Design a protein with these regions (language model features):
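Short, well-formed alpha-helical segments that are part of the catalytic scaffolds
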Residues: 7-25
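A conserved acidic beta->alpha catalytic loop
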Residues: 22, 34-43, 58
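Flexible acidic/His/Gly-enriched loops in nucleotide-sugar-dependent glycosyltransferase catalytic domains
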Residues: 88-165
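Glycine-rich, basic loop-to-helix element that forms the pyrophosphate-binding segment
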Residues: 57-73
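Short aromatic/hydrophobic "clamp" motif used to bind/position activated sugar donors
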Residues: 78
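Catalytic core of nucleotide-sugar-dependent glycosyltransferases
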Residues: 192-199, 205-234, 238, 242, ...
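Conserved nucleotide-sugar donor-binding catalytic segment
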Residues: 133-208
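Membrane-interface aromatic/basic loop that binds lipid-linked glycans or pyrophosphate carriers
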Residues: 25, 251-305
Length: 305
């Protein structure tokens, strides 16, 4: 059983060496997709890691790079790694052994930085049983990254799943939940798999109007990618809450957020099938300004606490 590790890279010559040191083990396929780098990323990989497959394309974004990697991959499972992050030691060995033993369509592992765990699931899902999309909806589990997961190649191709090109935010959220929305078997396993490397300035971002428009683009792409109505509503609600939170941080009004993102065109969100978040969705459908004030109140209480 072999995993295809797909690494999109753009001007990553300074970081991709350490990334590949943690990934290349001789047992699995590693594909680096150079997305139009100008710093010699592809040459650096070829020189230091001749066993790695290097694809080059014009700069088209991370979604297009991942799609190119999936098209070229021959492994039984896909794993996605960013060029400035790493895998934990023996992570591939442990994950591939469990995937070979249980054969899930989607295997969710652990993703950690030095400070915290990202998208924790312990206490919500057990590692000794299968789950499906109904379980994910009932638990209200949302994940904003495809990293730290294994996706079965045959399942992804059977579902004709692709990363959404043409948007530059929340593409991971859409792909992960599109995979969940199929009729696949989902497993969770307590394996320290993916190591997020935090760097100075990595959390900084410009929250200008273009940022909000990019984020809202995912809001409108979600229905075409996630056919399950309840799951799609959960994803769209999470995007709207993210828009609201960032608008508050920038001292923007609810009217500004609605106009800039075209939010009214996405409403109302359906509530059928929801187990968690029904009240929040109903509040949103009734009055976005009220939802905005609720989020504002929660942020204020959290800050004071």
């Amino acid at each position: 059983m072999r995993i295809s590790v797909i690494i999109p890279a753009y001007n990553a010559a300074d970081t991709i060496g350490a990334c590949l040191e943690s990934v290349v083990d001789g047992a699995h396929e590693v594909i680096v997709v150079d997305d139009g780098s100008t710093d010699g990323t592809a040459d650096a990989v070829r020189e230091a890691f001749p066993e790695v497959i290097v694809l080059q394309q014009s700069n088209q974004g991370v979604s297009a790079a991942r799609n190119a990697g999936m098209d070229a991959a021959t492994g039984d499972y896909f794993a996605f790694v960013d060029a400035d992050d790493r895998l934990f030691p023996v992570a591939l060995r442990e994950a591939s052994a469990f995937a070979e033993e249980t054969g899930p369509d989607l295997l969710v592992l652990r993703i950690l930085s030095d400070r915290e765990e990202h998208y924790p699931w312990e206490g919500r899902f057990r590692p000794d049983r299968d789950y499906d999309k109904k379980d994910i909806v009932e638990e209200g589990y949302l994940r904003g990254s495809v990293c730290g997961c294994l996706f079965k190649r045959d399942y992804i191709r059977r579902q004709a799943l692709r990363f959404p090109e043409g948007i530059s935010m929340a593409e991971d959220t859409l792909f992960f939940n599109a995979a969940v929305a199929g009729e696949g078997r989902i497993r969770f396993r307590d394996i320290r798999f993916y190591h997020v490397i935090e760097r100075p300035g990595s959390a900084s971002r410009s929250y200008d109007e273009a940022f909000f428009r990019r984020l809202s683009a995912a809001l409108f792409r979600a229905p075409e990618m996630i056919p399950d109505e309840a799951l799609c509503t959960q994803v769209r609600l999470s995007i709207i809450l993210s828009i609201t939170s960032h608008a508050l941080e920038q001292h923007r009004s609810p009217g500004w957020a609605r106009e800039t993102t075209g939010l009214d065109q996405a409403l109302p969100l359906p509530v059928r099938g929801l187990k968690k978040g029904r009240t929040m969705v109903r509040l949103l459908n009734a009055s976005y300004p009220l939802l905005y004030r609720l989020v504002q109140l929660k942020k204020t209480l959290t800050t004071r606490g």
